Amino acid sequence: MSDKIIEFDHVVAGYSPSRTILNETTLDARKGEITLLIGPNGAGKSTVLKTLFGMLTPRSGEVRFEGKRINGKAPRELLADGIAFVPQGRNRFGPLSGRHNRELGGITLQRGELAGRIDEVLTQFPRIRERIDNQASTMSGGEQKQLEVGRALLL
């Protein structure tokens, strides 16, 4: 069995037919390793992530997660496959409580399973556990980012 968790196999992608950003891009990310995308502005780092997370469909080539082809899958379908994305910046629903923000991350889980997963994830974020019923917009920037990461971990 392969230890590759993410594979790009000769992927071609861009934002218009005349603007190719990824040209025959091949990369592997292996389980248990840390993989960094490093490069100057415009090198394609964000395009790789948008392609991986279903925000951009490759024109050719294959993107695989745990050996399964995921080209063209919508972000919601990728959630069901166990792929979550915590983008830079703040991505919480301010008027909702921390608890409701967390529940949104578990949208693919059954209600009973969701409660158990939320409790499990909250053990990793004790400060968020204390403030889980507060409105997310009243949390500090760091707490909001913890909330977002916790939401992604609910998968």
Model feature map: region roles:
Residues 53:
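Helix-to-loop junction immediately C-terminal to a conserved catalytic motif
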Residues 135-139, 143:
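Conserved ABC ATPase signature
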Residues 15-17, 35, 73, 98-116, ...:
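ABC-type ATPase nucleotide-binding domains, specifically the catalytic core motifs of the NBD
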Residues 61-70, 81, 114-116, 120:
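Conserved ABC transporter NBD signature motif
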Residues 38-40:
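The feature captures the beta-strand-to-loop junction immediately N-terminal to the Walker
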Residues 6, 21-22:
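Conserved structural motif at the start of ABC-family nucleotide-binding domains
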Residues 152-153:
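ABC ATPase C-loop
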